[in-house]
């Protein structure tokens, strides 16, 4: 090994310590910058733009092709993480630092995200003509397809309007309009015609054409955001639609929603009681929950451990959503879609672990109520969870096959300091999960494969390093992460590469290396 390689290993081994808010010793980096940023996705929602850029730059300079492919995975609303702000911020860096790389992937931006993800490129001297030519070409295709009664893209829905209340939006609209050689009147007319052909629900709402809305065709997010407006302005038709939905006679779109989006809508703040309470049973929310894509597929080898500690009550960025909302939503989602002994079961942990049984919950509302009742709002003692699993195995003389193959920890990663029963066996620098692994080994068991799902870390502490203990490190809010959770891959970096090197992201690589 060369001197620099040895130095890198020395840094990772002896100069890589980080500490959580509650004193647990972990690491600053996994050893791979791409793995670091992937594990930090949820935390970056609350980060400043420069912090996002600094995190991405390290991965970009480590391996540009992999970093850009990962960025499209991060943005991917259907098969990835669905992170819009992170994608736009990192792409802005690429556009400024290496515009030729950004130019190559512009044709794929709308495929993985939305057309308006590229409007900020209009501020870039190199990329502006590339974006404008792309818009021109796509619009011509859409007009031809419309005239031939074929499906068209959603470009018209996202094109900026010249009469927008936002000055910035109007600037972008006029840049595009002038490139197309249109007057303001012609531009508005074209967008109106294409949006009418697309059957955009917001256009009908603005025109108060409630009776013309086809509820079975309303997109996922619109179903969630406008549910109250539909009931208020078109209650009879909306109720008729929801009744058919319960009977399985129609469908509802929910493919790009996050579980916590739905769970959070069930919450309301009760000022008289000074705390949150649950709203009444909601047919639309229940239907949207059932329509979420099933990424678990009855896998029965995984037990979820959901953090219910006090730090999980911190809100995520500028939303009312808390890390606890996310953890409860993912725990319910995973538990009810599992099979075998772990179906409708998960563990919650703070100062003491509890087994949560969702069997009595008939509706999503019921299950949220059960989950909330088990939120202890104390400190975060993850070690106690593994002690519970181990003692259960020992007391019942279980084999290795009887205990969970995977333990999925959904948390803000601010764990308590490791506590050893025999202090002589672990030094003050003992890492929390090394301590736990030793306990299992002494009892004749292998530690279950660990999956850490970060939903809001604030110290940036990584619980384990690359190739340690056979773990997966994931982050974000999308159920699409479940494929990585249930993967048998023991190396966290390879687990991530399996995802971003899949066929789904091959078009990105093809354009980059062309």
Which sequence ranges carry the predicted segments?
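Long lumenal/extracellular ectodomains of secretory and single-pass membrane proteins
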Residues: 1-326, 336-514
């Amino acid at each position: 090994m060369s001197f620099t390689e040895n130095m890198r290993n020395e840094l990772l081994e002896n100069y890589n310590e980080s500490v959580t808010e509650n004193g647990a010793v972990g690491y600053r980096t996994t050893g791979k910058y791409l793995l670091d940023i992937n594990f930090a996705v949820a935390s970056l929602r609350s980060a400043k733009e420069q912090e996002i850029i600094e995190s991405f730059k390290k991965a970009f300079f480590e391996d540009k092709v992999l970093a850009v492919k990962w960025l499209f995975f991060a943005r991917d609303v259907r098969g990835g993480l669905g992170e819009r702000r992170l994608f736009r911020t990192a792409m802005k860096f690429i556009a400024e630092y290496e515009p030729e790389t950004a130019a190559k992937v512009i044709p794929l931006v709308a495929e993985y995200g939305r057309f308006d993800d590229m409007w900020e490129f209009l501020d870039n001297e190199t990329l502006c003509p590339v974006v404008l030519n792309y818009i021109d070409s796509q619009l011509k295709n859409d007009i031809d397809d419309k005239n031939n009664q074929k499906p068209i893209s959603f470009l018209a829905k996202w094109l900026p309007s010249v009469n927008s209340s936002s000055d910035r939006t109007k600037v972008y609209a006029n840049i595009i309009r002038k490139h197309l050689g249109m007057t303001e009147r012609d531009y508005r007319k074209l967008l109106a015609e294409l949006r009418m052909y697309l059957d955009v629900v917001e256009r009908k709402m603005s025109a108060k054409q409630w009776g013309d809305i086809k509820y079975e065709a309303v997109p996922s997010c619109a179903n969630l955001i406008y549910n109250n407006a539909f009931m208020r302005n078109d209650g009879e038709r909306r109720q008729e639609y929801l009744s058919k939905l319960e009977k399985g006679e129609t469908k509802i779109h929910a493919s790009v929603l996050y579980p916590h989006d739905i769970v959070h809508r069930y919450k309301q703040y009760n000022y008289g009681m000074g705390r949150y309470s649950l709203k009444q049973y909601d047919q639309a929310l229940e239907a949207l929950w059932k329509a979420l894509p099933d990424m678990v597929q009855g896998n029965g080898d995984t037990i979820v451990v959901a953090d219910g500690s006090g730090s999980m009550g911190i809100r995520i960025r500028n939303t009312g959503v808390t890390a606890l909302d996310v953890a409860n939503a993912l725990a319910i989602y995973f538990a009810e879609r599992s099979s075998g002994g772990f179906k409708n079961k998960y563990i919650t942990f703070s100062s003491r672990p509890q087994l949560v049984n969702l069997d009595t919950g008939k509706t999503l509302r019921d299950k949220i109520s059960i989950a909330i009742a088990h939120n202890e709002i104390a400190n975060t003692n993850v070690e106690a969870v593994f002690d519970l699993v181990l003692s259960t195995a020992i007391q019942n003389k279980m084999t290795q096959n009887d205990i969970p193959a995977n333990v999925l920890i959904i948390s803000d990663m601010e764990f308590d300091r490791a506590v050893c029963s025999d202090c002589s066996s672990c030094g003050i620098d003992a890492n929390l999960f090394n301590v736990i692994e030793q306990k299992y080994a002494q009892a004749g068991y292998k530690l279950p494969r660990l999956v850490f799902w970060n939903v809001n870390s604030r110290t940036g502490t990584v619980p384990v390093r690359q190739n340690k203990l056979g773990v997966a490190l994931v982050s974000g809010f999308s159920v699409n992460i479940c494929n990585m959770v249930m993967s048998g891959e023991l190396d966290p970096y390879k687990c991530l590469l399996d995802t971003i090197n899949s066929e789904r992201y091959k078009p990105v690589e093809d354009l980059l290396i062309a």
